[in-house]
Amino acid sequence: MQQDILINWSPQETRVAVLESGAVQELHVERTLERGLVGNVYLGKVARVLPGMQSAFIDIGLERAAFLHVADLLGAHPAVRGANSEERDAPLVPIEKQVFEGQALMVQVIKDPIGTKGARLSTQISIAGRMLVFLPQDDHMGISQKIPLAQREALRLRMNALAGPPDAPGGGGGFILRTNGEDASDAELAEDIAYLRKTWARIKDASVHLPPQSLLHQDLDLLKRVMRDLVGELTQSIRLDSREQFQNLLAFGQEF
């Protein structure tokens, strides 16, 4: 069924309605001041390492330093995927052997600041796409647990073929197929893979050229999530009441 998307934008709030045959099927609202930090990627600077707590405070340019626990450090566990149970249960590598004060560290917010507590961080980066989640530092190919078990292996084989060899130019990384990607075509999945890898390339490039305490990647706002998640072959029109935001959407669509 064909759909129309109506967008009302103001500096304080964005509202999106998805219509089918003139009837509202979905309504999304995002208030600017209530946007969280989860998903944002920063180039942080280690401010303090606390061996007793197996954690570190990271300055990411916010009012309060953010918190990084050893369990959220990439490479904290010596075991590799597929290792036996004894290796998987091996102790974590102590945080003081992995990070040091003054070190620049790429981190992602996994929990928003609450009260007097700063944001919680991870060095294990994940980037959400329309149908996939990209794990650029991993090689795992996962399938949503909500997809029937009988279909997962075939989907995993498809994903491995579409992702290509890890040593290919622009290749590498792991993916998780989200539930809404179960019936996606190869072309749709390949498009999402390309978008996610391009996003990661931009993040890496920014991490080289920007100083510590810089924002490298901000999770998409509602307008861009509309383009990523809602616009498809059945979309016959998008109506937006802001010329400036219309130009931003055009630029986003052309770039990705």
Please name every model-derived segment.
Residues 1-256:
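Single-stranded RNA-binding surfaces
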